[in-house]
Regions:
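Conserved small/polar residues in nucleotide/adenosyl-binding loops
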Residues: 619-623
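Active-site cores of enzymes that catalyze phosphoryl transfer or operate on phosphate-rich substrates
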Residues: 519, 532-605, 609-614
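Conserved short alpha-helical segments that host acidic/polar catalytic motifs at enzyme active sites
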Residues: 2-553, 566, 574-577
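Secondary-structure boundary elements
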Residues: 250, 615-616
Length: 624
């Protein structure tokens, strides 16, 4: 097996953190939970009918990725001669190992050690039959050794499911820190008591042929989630094929850099009764994976912490609401509360998800990726990124339609019930007294008044302009026309200004931020054309509080209608003494004569002062 030195390693302008893709997704589920091989076969046909959604190499044999998520086929496993206990009392999943025997053994030792730490046993290791002959050159060169693990030792399914999650995260953490040469070839595709995933660096037509298990008539499931990957600006790899552990995703998360950064920042204050030592499973988001994988990591963590699957999805991918798109007051309060806790994972996205019991789909709040659904009279539901993925006679169809922006459609296979968005969101909105919490704790900046006289001039105006990097052109050509005409000034000849980081002159803070790639949409989107899904609302307060435990203390925030403040509003914030709020001024000055060392000392002092005053609203000032 060749070493993947050319894949997934940061080099030149390529960074694996920028992984995005655009794909085909499909879900087929028996609403009443009935299992059959027919569902697996139908799902594979859905995948094959979306072949045009995936990408292939020049050899027409190397795909960007294809996969299927199924319920664990208990009877099929018994027929393989594996003496597993009854359903729900064992965990299983596919694991990708390097083909080097020494590395394989070293990784297996780590796995066994972590499994036994939780009081469990690695009961069996099955070599998954595969058909390597159908692979293209690139896929064959990087093909892992695929094994199916079976873990026993706990009779409580919920407890075992959580233990399996913790074990996998610990193994991933140890592998990332290990010196095993091909450790990046190791990947746990799934490890669960409820679902199993078959996937790889395949194209849609290859999946059933590469994994003979999938064509065995005794392999049954009550639901199936399929995915055909098209990498828009990334390398195909075995580990980045979808579905992931809970979801399959068509689209992009354009806010991914901020989402990852904020999630990493709040890890230190997270705590959950279900996961006593969260430090052991950090980082929650596995490094060097795609945007879809990062979203799946966070979704999986929330569900493992006790949050319901629809609650977690509604929190991560909220729908829009305003005067043009009214929703109930209770649901509005639900979203306002959660907007304080978690920034939206935003971007064009069709999301299908399942944990083995629940299965459903939703769209992003813009609705920029399509998804259609169909329900038959005999209790089958199909959701896919396009119509026509399965053939039905017209008299078989009970209902069909398209998923709406920000709306969820969910099936509970144990209850045998379809939950539409309205019923789901009503349950979520009524779970806590969100409106009361907000009313008692949240402060609206626009409603605060001050008797202080605040001048609308700035002392040392010219000096302050130079200090903050404003040029005459910024004032005369950009800011003044915006203030006078309420429109953004239009210029020609493009922007040929060098990067701010290379300039010898002071630069505006904003000049250091650029688009990472061509973040465009068709049609164009801006706050004027799309005010239905745009918001300038900002919150100031204790952003890093523990988001896993519902608490009205999270609502102790100051709400800003927009981030641009008047002098009066800024003065109110700097002198706030209302509902327990208070503020502290932190000077951001240093002795220029001391050069770089003076700047470093001043920054260290600023950080220390911020830590000491963290219970207050902090604001920096260019004055002592």
């Amino acid at each position: 097996m060749k070493v993947r030195s050319h894949l997934n390693n940061k080099q030149g302008l390529y960074d694996p953190a920028n992984e995005h893709d655009a794909c085909g997704v499909g879900l087929i589920v028996n609403v009443h939970g009935g299992k059959s091989h027919g569902i697996v076969e139908s799902a594979l046909k859905v995948l094959e009918n979306m072949r045009h959604r995936g990408a292939e190499g020049a050899d027409n044999k190397t795909g960007d990725g294809a996969g299927i998520l199924l319920q664990i086929p208990h009877e099929f496993i018994l027929l393989q001669g594996i003496p597993v206990p009854e359903k729900g009392k064992y965990g299983t999943g596919l694991v990708f190992f390097p083909k080097d025997e020494k590395q394989h053994s070293a990784i297996l030792s780590i796995m066994i050690e972590e499994i036994e730490k939780e009081g469990l046993t690695l009961m069996h290791l099955r070599k998954v039959p595969v058909n390597t002959d159908i692979l293209g050159k690139d896929a064959r060169d990087t093909e892992p050794d695929i094994k199916q693990v079976f873990i026993t030792g706990c009779d409580d399914q919920q407890v075992l499911e959580l233990k399996l999650y913790i074990i996998r995260k610990r193994i991933e953490k140890r592998m990332a820190a290990s010196d095993i040469p091909n450790r990046k070839d190791f990947y746990v595709a799934s490890l669960s008591t409820k679902s199993i995933i078959y996937k790889g660096m395949l194209e849609s037509m290859q999946l059933r042929h590469y994994f003979p298990d999938l064509t065995n008539p005794y392999l049954t499931s009550g639901l199936a989630l399929v995915h055909s990957r098209f990498s828009t600006n990334t390398f195909p790899t075995w580990s980045l094929a979808q579905p992931f552990r809970l979801l399959a995703h068509n689209g992009e998360i354009n806010t991914i850099r901020g989402n990852r950064g904020w999630m990493e920042a709040r890890e230190s204050v997270l705590s959950s009764p279900r996961i006593p030592n969260i430090d052991e499973i950090r980082p929650i988001i596995q490094p060097d994976m795609s945007d879809s994988a990062s979203l799946d990591n966070v979704l999986e963590f929330f569900v493992a912490s006790g949050m319901s699957l629809p609650h977690a999805m509604a929190m991560l991918v909220p729908e829009s609401f305003n005067e043009k798109n009214p929703i109930s007051e209770d649901l509005k309060a639900f979203y306002e509360y959660h907007s304080i806790l978690m920034e939206p994972w935003d971007g064009p996205a069709a999301l299908l998800f399942s944990d083995g019991r629940y299965a459903g789909g939703m769209l992003d709040r813009n609705g920029l990726r399509p998804a259609r659904y169909l329900i038959t009279k005999n209790g089958m539901m199909v959701v896919a990124s396009e119509v026509g993925v399965m053939d039905f006679e017209p008299d078989e169809i009970e209902e069909k339609g398209r998923l709406q922006p920000g709306k969820i459609l969910l099936v509970d296979t144990e209850e045998g019930k379809i939950y539409y968005d309205g019923e789901l969101k009503k349950q979520l909105a009524g779970a806590q007294f969100y409106r009361v919490w907000l009313a008692n704790n949240r402060v609206e900046l626009d409603e605060l008044k001050s008797g202080r006289h605040v001048p609308h001039t700035v002392a040392g105006y010219d000096r302050m302009l130079r200090t903050f990097g404003y040029s005459r052109e910024d004032i005369e050509r950009i800011i003044a026309p915006m203030c006078i005409g309420s429109t953004e000034p239009v210029g020609s000849m493009g922007n040929d200004i060098p990067l701010a980081v290379l300039s010898e002159h002071p630069q505006l803070l904003f000049n250091y931020f650029r688009q990472q790639f061509a973040q465009v949409t068709n049609p164009p989107i801006d706050p004027l054309r799309e005010d239905l899904v745009m918001s300038l609302t900002e919150y100031i307060g204790a952003v890093g509080s523990n988001i896993l435990i519902p608490n009205e203390a999270h609502c102790k925030m100051v709400r800003l209608a927009h981030p641009i403040l008047t002098n009066t509003q800024l003065d109110i914030l700097c002198n706030i003494r209302y509902k327990g709020f208070k503020s502290v001024k932190l000077p951001m000055l240093f002795e220029v004569s001391q050069g770089c060392e003076g700047l470093k000392t001043a920054l260290d002092r600023l950080c220390m002062q911020a830590e000491q005053s963290v219970a207050c609203l902090l604001y920096t000032s260019p004055s002592p």
